[in-house]
Amino acid sequence: MAVALTEYRIETDGKFFRRNGQRVWLRTVTYGPFPPGKPASRTTEFARIRETGFDSIRIFTLPDRALLDDAERAGLTVFAGLNWDHYGDFLKKPVRLSAANVRLDAWLREHATHPALTGIYVGNEISSDLVRWMGPAPVREAIESLIELGRNIAPHLLFAYANYPSTEYLEPANADFSAFNIYLEDRDAFTAYLRRLQNIAGDRPLVVSEFGMDSLRNSLETQAETLGWARQTAHQEETAGFTVFSWSDLWARGTSEITDWDFGITDRDGNEKPACNTLRKFASSPSTHNAKFTVIVCTRNGSERITACLRALGRMTGNPFDTIVVDDGSEDGTAALVDAEFPDIRLISIPPSGLSAARNIGADAATAEILAFTDDDCEPDREWLIRLEKAFQDPDVAAAGGPNLPPPARTPAEAVIRSAPGAPSHVLLDDTSAEHLPGCNIAVRRAVFQAIGGFDSVFRTAGDDVDFCWRLSDAGHRLAFVPGAFVWHWRRPSLRAFLRQQLGYGKAEKFLLTKHPVRFGKNGEARWTGFVYGGGAIRAEDDSVIYHGPMGQAGYQSIVNRMLPLRPIDSAFRNPWTNFLLALVRILQPAARRWARNRRIRFGFTKPAAAESPSPVREFGIAGTDGWSRDHCLSILLHAGWQASGNTDPWDLEKGGTRVLVAAENLGGGLTNCLFRVWGSHAAAIALEHELRAAQSPDESLPN
């Protein structure tokens, strides 16, 4: 019986996905590409996939309508793949990228409205050496251009790029979710890397777009066990979905069947492996902890905001909790509104006393073991407390919090403000520990709160959370970061209100500087030990320093100067005017804070650094077959006395002042074109080319 998919589609929901208003966790399996004529019956295969517990398939091509129809009948959604020629330098030969644009455009115009289609992967694992060759920023911009094209045609679909650890810095800014192909067979390493990727993903959902194990080199039982714990771990670590690679051992590159690996959970004859039964039994782990929470919301003149906040709390799932609203001398009827519309919520009205005092009064009235604070302009996610509760299962955790995400912009001003610096942000010491958690999303053990004296009432409108977290850290307590425990936090509605807020933050920083002078620099800016969260996915820019490893061969390559980027302007509002406004705000925001803090204005202009690297003197390519590869070329040069690069050098080898970068293009049919970029003298570059052409034979004897 067909399952209707026409009424709703999958959408992003903060760090997760939802369908028809309900949170969904994607359970996906890759399907194909297959040798010609196989499998025999797609209809039967799709029914088996659904019965095994998957709700979606990922394919590596743009499918025909028949496949989409079969998926719809089976109750499966489809993530299609734009398979284009990114196996060579598509910047030097832009026809490759142009062809991808034309193909995506034509396919979407024909198939974008199909009810089974959920999303598009616009690329998959562009080779790290080619990314290094073309430059991370231009490659990322090319990926972003494909996403932009697709979104303009089909804004209802999800768009992403399937990344992998060797280019984790290549995250497109405009993707709907971050996707990583991960093959880590150690559970602890897999867990740690997912936690890292949550912060690389920024505000958006994280999906494991491939995870698999070869049962040819491992036992069937080991494959089943590994896939079982990997999917369970991905769920526990708050990803938005998990993709098993792959459904079948049948696999082809072009028309050639691949027989030297068995990643499928069914064999080449269609028989189930033990992994199918393991995956069929998957269930989320229930919480074994029953911590009691009191949620404290402080408000002043919040009548236009607090209803949405309290209704969001009313939709909260999990164990019962108490809610206390502290009305800090409102003059707009806030207290009467809360009393009339939310009679089950405890309301405490006080004369105007300031935010810190209001929070302390709420804490004094609470009886639960954990105090959770949020603001009247926030709407906590329905799973907020459940996810915070898991953090407190660790007895060493004194406080915990998650991201505060801006809701989608409704106006151009909101679009600019949600992309501007200066919003309340968490600061991370590592992937799971925080130096600072904003007061709009922080929970703390009541005993610890009382032990350090709560919030300092000298801070009336802002800065109290910074002081509170620093005092927690100074007392030796751990602050945990929980990426899935998010609240929607409305930013200021206008640029005037936003800059007025920044002046208030600057005034608060005056008190912080007096109280914590060692935590500030000579110009009055806070000196954080960790990284300030900006909301955008971590991605390389033109001036980024990237750890590639010697000769660019590190399996995990990352940005060294990890300045966490801000969110991009929503594409619906991005135009020259909003780009100009954002550039202006990025100048005025720190200036406003500096004026309020120091009573002086100093705009943050810096003189661009002069380029240090000379231009290459020669580029050339040498094509070959039967073992001609980048690794082979590097071996030739190492044998000839060339020295390997350092971890962050933009070249691979050096000899006598001459440097060379090597990349490889896969031209198909077993043909590889090795690319060489040379710095130094023209004579040395020509000599290098002659040396390589002379040694081109892959049968050349090389030392071990």
Task: Give the residues covered by each predicted segment.
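Short, acidic, metal-binding catalytic loop of nucleotide-sugar glycosyltransferases
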Residues: 311-320
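Short aromatic/hydrophobic "clamp" motif used to bind/position activated sugar donors
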Residues: 371
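Glycine-rich, basic loop-to-helix element that forms the pyrophosphate-binding segment
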Residues: 350-366, 428, 432, 440
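Aromatic-rich peripheral "rim/lid" segments of glycoside hydrolase catalytic domains that contact
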Residues: 245-292
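Conserved donor NDP-sugar-binding/catalytic core segment of glycosyltransferases
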Residues: 383-414, 478, 490
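Short, flexible, basic/aromatic active-site loop/helix in glycosyltransferases
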Residues: 402-403, 417-435, 450
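Active-site mouth of glycoside hydrolases
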Residues: 11-14, 18-175
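A conserved acidic beta->alpha catalytic loop
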Residues: 312, 327-336, 378
